[in-house]
Amino acid sequence: MNQLHRRMGTFSLMMVGLGSMIGSGWLFGAWRAAQIAGPAAIISWVIGMVVILFIALSYSELGSMFPEAGGMVKYTQYSHGSFIGFIAGWANWIAIVSVIPVEAVASVQYMSSWPWEWAKWTSGLVKNGTLTGEGLAFASVLLLIYFLLNYWTVNLFSKANSLITIFKIIIPGLTIGALLFVGFHGENFTGGQSIAPNGWASVLTAVATSGIVFAFNGFQSPINMAGEAKNPGKSIPIAVVGSLFVATVIYVLLQIAFIGAVNPSDIAHGWSHLNFNSPFADLAIALNINWLVIVLYADAFVSPSGTGITYTATTSRMIYGMEKNKYMPSIFGKLHPIYGVPRQAMFFNLIVSFIFLFLFRGWGVLAEIISVATLISYITGPITVMTLRRTGKDLYRPLRLKGLNVIAPLGFIFASLVLYWARWPLTGQVLFIILIGLPIYFYYQAKAKWKGFGRNFKAGVWMVFYLLAMMVISYLGSDKFGGLNVIHYGWDMVLIAMVSLVFYVWALKSGYQTEYLKDAKEINSQLLNGQSEAAAGKE
């Protein structure tokens, strides 16, 4: 069996997107953003949404054109061949698979600060912001639970995720209302200081490193589940954009409530000194909102677990998709004959999740790595969708975006800027993690006797030079972003925009009608035939 079951409607797919976005990001993101940017963290969330929206629009057109499992790791291969397709797919998979352990870490970290006398033992689960041996054991159990809920069928996943996501929307809503009503301090938004007490550069850094990009990363989950969508042409764009907007409203309101609820004395020496183990629960305890404390500690399991369950599903489809691209062993392309899920891919991702869990035991470190790896994978979306407008003119497009010739380059530039805002040396460190995957690509190229390698490498080499250019600019850039200050603040971002535009043009000209585009056309024609049959059935 090698065909996935199409059972998910628009609502289920939107819940997948929301379920991916409202995880540990809401439990920790507002605190980290406020710590970095102060009250201006509200602006950071809006900037982050705009950046991700421009990227998501490109992927929405692609997702509606090619409704297949693990689509996010396949699209670039259709437009530029296997070399850059592998880099983008590998970066995307690294970013997504590492979300699974970070959600487990978040649950255990909240658990470590349980205030009840009978639960004092939980304080030993976390020391200095990282999990202890006992903490790792609890997190490992959570990983197994995520795995088992996806093991049998997509129906079980879909039902469990929709229920969990509804719960995850209600709890942030209750938190927002309670904090605004009981303990709102309007002076926290100015307090005699600038709204951006740490400078406007910190507002930009917060977008990249506080968990904002990490939180919005879930927009791609409906795209990766497109192979199981009943009507992907309609469902994918609605699910992607709809879940992004709903999540933004929730996150902005949470940020406002968090900033207003902090005791002014706690920020007397600056927002950077604000330290919490369980941010919203700690605020609820300080304000004596006892019912909210209990609800938040319960949600600290539900929200991250819901996201962990979602990503366990989507990452298995990504490995399934990478096998179809000939980047992974054929065993990962097999589906269970009854349940229609890629179990071997799920086992592989479970092992990788354990590796990430034991190597990176803190939420903050994992969130930063995920954010930068995500940005590297995102930059190919605008390139691919515009290239296919030229090389795949005959493809059926259920969603054909107007103004894409403006949206796509802006999305590419915005993603480049956020990558730069992540600060040196983090940008260089994550780039190294991405490059680790190249030996896998070269191994499978050698097995194929380097067939077509020259053309594929030529079409994708711009990506290598782009990443190197970003590294150099980050290293020499403003000291506000961790650089040597050879390129001063302001001019550094102008340079990033100009360099990005040059690489954008180079990338578009590098695209060609790849051999993989034939497979894409087959998927696309099946979509057209399916919609034609559905229309005929209504008559």
Curated annotation (Swiss-Prot):
Where are the bilayer-spanning segments?
11-31, 36-56, 82-102, 137-157, 164-184, 199-219, 238-258, 283-303, 350-370, 401-421, 424-444, 457-477, 486-506
Q: Which GO terms describe its biological process?
A: amino acid transport
Positions in coiled-coil regions: none
UniProt keyword annotations, A-Z: Amino-acid transport, Cell membrane, Membrane, Symport, Transmembrane, Transmembrane helix, Transport
Q: Which family does it belong to?
A: Belongs to the amino acid-polyamine-organocation (APC) superfamily. AGT (TC 2.A.3.11) family.
**Protein name as catalogued:** Glutamate/serine transporter AimA
Pfam families per the record?
A: AA_permease_2
Entry GO CC: plasma membrane
Q: Where in the cell is it found?
A: Cell membrane
GO molecular function per UniProt:
symporter activity
